[in-house]
Amino acid sequence: LKDLKSRGLLDSTLVIWGGEFGRKPTRDRNGGDNPGRDHNAKAFSVVMAGGGVKGGVVHGATDDLGAESASDKVHVHDLHATILHLLGLDHEQLTYRFQGRDYRLTDVHGHVVKGILS
């Protein structure tokens, strides 16, 4: 980020780090040779910077355990809609045809998360 900023490129470059699921706050109870924390589809984190994103903003929160989203929930379709918006694309117009029907990449539920836009 420092390098992009020093070169004057951060405002025109969208940087994203994250994934579409988080990790459960508890350890798996199944034991075995590879104990760890399972996927958690109820809470995930994404870091975004530059390219139209407001700096220093935290959007949403989990419960006290970090197990589930508690406020300002963002669905993966919302994340995709927001990314497409920041890239200058209208997610509602971006479709693909499958089995004779047009589908949106963000389904019918995706909305741009306006609170993080600069």
Predicted regions and their residues:
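Ligand-binding pockets and gating/stacking loops
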Residues: 1-118
